[in-house]
């Protein structure tokens, strides 16, 4: 009964909501290649692509059911929301990608983590890096059986563990990506309000979101890559500025200000914030698959996480030792000189604006690959018209997605609490619990007792961090909301 209702709803939406009637061309055109998969110049459009590449989805009115092999190919086409590279990448390039993911915008909040958690926060920065490195290794091991690659994505690993479990992984990935977009809005608004307090935070969020509506039209990974490149440049500039500024006050530092005192109410939020900053597992399978020499993956991942841990510890300590009790949620807001603060904050705002398109694009691709490739492969019709342009309703849905991130940001405009809550939910699942759980299930027959205990230990630790973190982070968020209302 429920399946019939879903089928009726699906048919109705395909006919009336995601309708081809918006197109003015002849809808009887068959075998039109999709927007994302045009053949290269000189290639024959009749030759099918290899089975492990994303296949064109044909716009067709033919009503016959697809063959089982075709459905399997469509399943293989779905990835983690990140497009494949046009050519294999080196270990150094892979390390750069991982470093960008875990050394991102949110390091500006590390000094406040040291202020709140002291040496416990510093220990978390090192410990979480260690665990995330090992769970990344475990996740990649789940792709192989007897040295042969059997699976390609995080979702395929989850579905092998339990059919249908991959949907939970996709939901966590989507939550992680959209949460990242939301936090960029909160961060940009915080920085702008500190520079120009005549406009409140909500106003700056709306202004920032208006400029980000153009992301709704992004459909070229090359453009997203260029934006990410400029984002990396701005990241290096602002980090260099802040490190040099902090080093100029080295004579005033006092390491005794970093305490061992433990506040059980705030520490789980800080740990979640640290976990959120190390989450890169959603694209590790794709990254490993695109390396020229996948055997170098473990070494690459190890040194990437070592570098990240060292930099995060140093940056967090430098910021707190320089500003002490005056340390703000964003380190640049701690700067005493207003003109200098405006300069640094504006660079950070540009970085936030350049950072938003990548997770947004990945979220859009995730939704497209699982909902909008075309019926019957996915529940709804394709986002693209036969002339390879994006349909009007698809653009509208993307605009709604941008507005959704704005709505959530307006509802919970609290940077540290939001990062902590997201890290304790999706971060612990994607980076702690699931990789160890899947590895224990898939490799159980080949693991020795120590390796089994190691996986079980990570699962127990991840569950403990998740449960306690969600509770205390939620309490911290509620306190922040109540404090703002009073």
Swiss-Prot record:
GO terms for cellular component: dendrite terminus; neuron projection terminus; synaptic vesicle; synaptic vesicle membrane. Residues 66-85 have a biased composition (Basic and acidic residues). Residues 29-46 have a biased composition (Polar residues). Keywords: Cytoplasmic vesicle, Glycoprotein, Membrane, Neurotransmitter transport, Transmembrane, Transmembrane helix, Transport. Residues 115-119, 189-203, 250-263, 327-341, 420-421, 479-486 are lumenal, vesicle. Changing residue 462 to R: In N2409; loss of GABA transport into synaptic vesicles. GO terms for molecular function: glycine transmembrane transporter activity. The keyword Transmembrane helix applies. InterPro entries: AA_transpt_TM (IPR013057). Disulfide bonds: none annotated. It comes from the Eukaryota. Its main location: membrane. Involved in the uptake of GABA into the synaptic vesicles. This is Vesicular GABA transporter. It comes from Caenorhabditis elegans. The gene is unc-47.
